[in-house]
């Protein structure tokens, strides 16, 4: 065994830093406070002007695991992460941001899972939260079906159904990557103002032979849900998403992966374009991007391999066609989410669920007056599934109208309802507690469909 092998850390943590002084110390403390200690922390200072470099140097003086690279000029997150990867020595790579915080057992649980399962990629829970709620510890309990599918044995997403890839976020910060997987496939972050991680993460997930999720349902990464000065990618231009996936498609074709995985690609592209439109805070720019998709963008996506595109299922092909046939102002894309896809892929299963309760004279309420609630109600209406009420615990939503229903509180409907079907993810335990000893059965539609 060489000296290099002996001193090689198990994990290399790459952290780009740009004007993150408001939260940087907190982020560093949550890394240095990890129960797992065999790592190096590579901080890339991207010409910060707010004292971030001084904070990094202060911590470096007290902990030899910290190294600092200074960019000669402001280059952005992609350049910084790529530079950090070049000097990384760890068996696994992790990418963190300088304004987030991390559960103290994150790396211990992730690395243990990686070694036990011989994984190329380990994923774990994350949550977008506001700064004032970032210290609230949260669990997101998995269903048994979800655990069996994603946590207990490693898998290759290329062997799973295309829609399942949608459940894996394309942010880099909730994953451990085997460094050899990244280096052997020459994966780097794309030089884009935003969305520079999409190509890197998507290709890594497709190329990984063994991916697994940490079985523990504690949230591991708390991502600040804001456009803070600590984030390098502030400008969510939807065109960056388009460019990222065009590169993915071209790379898949070059690696002879497209014929086998074309559906995985097109599913992800459709929903990512939809998400990009919704994420752009500049309405005029979003409208211009939509016009680009109508005029030429969708045709370019189709033409990566028109033969493969023709073999797609009708649901996704119709989705792409909607970009061309509907105008931006119609807002049709707002309701094209993952729940809707899984509902339509499991019509018979969902129909049987409703028929079971209706045959026993049980009345059903939908819990959740948000996007998922609207999607579920529209699905029920189209398939003649009877819903008696809509309930939400938000006082702002109670009394408003959703799909012809007046949104009620639990207290208002609890005497008349025997079944509640939850539309939103990860609130099952909260709803069960709210129902208490009332004689109401609670079903989580996302768990039922193995989305959560």
Q: How would you name each of these model-derived features?
A:
Residues 9-12, 30, 40, 199:
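Cell-envelope/extracellular polymer assembly enzymes that use nucleotide-activated donors
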Residues 19-33:
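Short, well-formed alpha-helical segments that are part of the catalytic scaffolds
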Residues 30, 37, 45-54, 73:
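A conserved acidic beta->alpha catalytic loop
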Residues 71-88:
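Glycine-rich, basic loop-to-helix element that forms the pyrophosphate-binding segment
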Residues 93:
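Short aromatic/hydrophobic "clamp" motif used to bind/position activated sugar donors
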Residues 98-215, 220-238, 303-307:
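Donor-binding/catalytic cores of nucleotide-activated saccharide
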Residues 281-345, 355-363, 382:
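Membrane-interface aromatic/basic loop that binds lipid-linked glycans or pyrophosphate carriers
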Residues 334-452:
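Hydrophobic, well-ordered beta-alpha structural blocks that scaffold small-molecule cofactor pockets
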